């Protein structure tokens, strides 16, 4: 309670709204009121159960040693080049991007494509902060990272490099990566056994490993993974 004002001031520095919503006492009950009427009155012991306990055994399979980081033998460089250029992951997304009006935002700093011929995709998004009066030179940056082939070979390595790639793109755009926050998105197959559960477990470990190495935290995201 004595730290509430300091906590609120820290939140304000991050442009976040914070307010005191409850007082903690030793009654052992959670009581909520609305317009003077008591609408919730439940035991703290019930809350401590945190619902049904859920535990899973996982098996994290070792990735194939003859995998992603092993350089293939080059027999026909022309054929390999054409195969790489025909990969959907290397295809131009300009047609899709142009279906959205990238000029509608007054705070837009980077266009989706740049360079002499307006064909080079930007490493991420940059936009000025909205201000009520005057002008600002302050902007926010956002970038993403994901390697589908790497993640298929090893969810652990996929998560590690997803975090690293997104932060690297921020650096390439000129942002201070030390002030970055992460948000993680997940999508996995139906989880039915120890091996399938091992895939999201490995990805979580990989993401957390890189978060700890960089000293960056995840502050929420889509679905369930950022927690």
PLM feature segments, named:
Residues 1-227:
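Glycine/proline-enriched, intrinsically flexible loops and inter-domain linkers
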């Amino acid at each position: 309670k004595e730290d509430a004002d300091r906590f609120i001031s820290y939140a304000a520095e991050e442009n976040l709204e914070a307010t005191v919503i409850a007082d903690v006492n030793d009654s052992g009950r959670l009581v909520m009121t609305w317009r003077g009427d008591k609408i919730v009155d439940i035991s703290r012991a019930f809350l401590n159960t945190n619902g049904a306990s859920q535990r899973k055994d996982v098996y994290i399979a070792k990735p194939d040693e003859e995998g992603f980081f092993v350089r293939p033998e080059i027999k026909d460089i022309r054929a390999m080049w054409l195969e790489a250029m025909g990969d959907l992951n290397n295809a131009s997304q300009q047609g899709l991007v142009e279906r959205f009006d990238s000029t509608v935002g007054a705070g837009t700093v980077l266009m989706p494509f740049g360079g002499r011929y307006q064909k080079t995709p930007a490493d991420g998004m940059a936009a000025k902060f909205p201000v009520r009066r005057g002008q600002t030179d302050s902007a926010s940056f956002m970038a993403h990272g994901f390697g589908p082939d790497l993640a298929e070979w090893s969810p652990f390595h996929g998560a590690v490099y997803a975090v690293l790639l997104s932060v690297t793109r921020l650096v390439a755009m000129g942002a201070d990566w030390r002030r970055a926050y992460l948000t993680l998105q997940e999508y996995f197959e139906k989880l039915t056994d120890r091996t399938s559960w091992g895939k999201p477990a490995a990805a979580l470990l990989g993401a957390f490993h890189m978060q700890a190495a960089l000293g960056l935290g995840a502050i929420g995201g889509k679905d369930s993974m950022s927690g």
